[in-house]
Amino acid sequence: MSGSDVQLVQSLTRGLAVIRAFSGARPRQTLAQVAEATGLPRATVRRFLHTLVAEGYASSDGTVFWLTPKTLELGFSYLSSLGLPAIAQPHLDGLSRKLNESSSLTVLDGSDVVYVARAAANRIMSVNITIGTRFPAYATSMGRVLLADLPSAQLDAYLADTALEPITPETVTSEDALKQLLIDVQRQGYCIVDQELELGLRSVACPVRGDDGKVVAAVNVSAHAGAVGHREVVDKLLPPLQATASAIERDLQTTTLKETS
């Protein structure tokens, strides 16, 4: 590889780091904040941000920058090839209508969960969740479902690379406590997270498995903690959620069989 090739690869890596600096928790940032989040020089970040603005992938008011919906184009090819969001969407829509609560599907990407399908009912979170929204896996019900299926070596690597920071006063930040919770998820087949990602938000998630039995995604239902108690989550939200996950799995398996036949 020539020196120019190395430079091009590094340039792409830095540009992607700038894009990843924006998230559902940090949708609008100044140049200084992006530089701090990425560890890149301010001059480098400035060039990338202005390039993103010029190409329509970001906007700015002169001080603050934010990504535009055009960035979704970067992931559409992957999502289309994945097929899973299209399969899951009608099931999420039906579940959301039945429960009058929001339902989502996520996959694990690095240390985050990424939303790939969603049926929104009442807005509970202060952050507007859309396709492509990312949250730290350790603090979400879907994230813990996905983490619970990782081989031990991969889980250890995740924990070594991830700072378990308190997002709310309820967030579990102990590695040992998180590991025990993941064992519980494996045993019971679902996960409830109570106000760890945002105060007032309670959610329950269960896995979506491929035909090989491995977890390929997680599906959840979220509700306002003041309106839906823990017992009600188990008794009223979990059974239809599990039925939805099973329906997605059946459709996913059918689609896979058609593609291979």
Labelled PLM ranges:
Residues M1-A86, D93, S246, R250-T254:
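N-terminal helix-turn-helix
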Residues L8-L12, T68, S81, P85, ...:
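Short, structured helix-loop boundary elements
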Residues V64-T162:
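Amphipathic alpha-helical effector-binding/dimerization core
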Residues A88-L95, L159-A205, D251:
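Short, basic/aromatic recognition patches
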Residues L181, V216-S261:
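Juxtadomain coupling helices with adjacent low-complexity linkers
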Residues V208-D211:
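Sensor-regulatory modules in signal-transduction proteins
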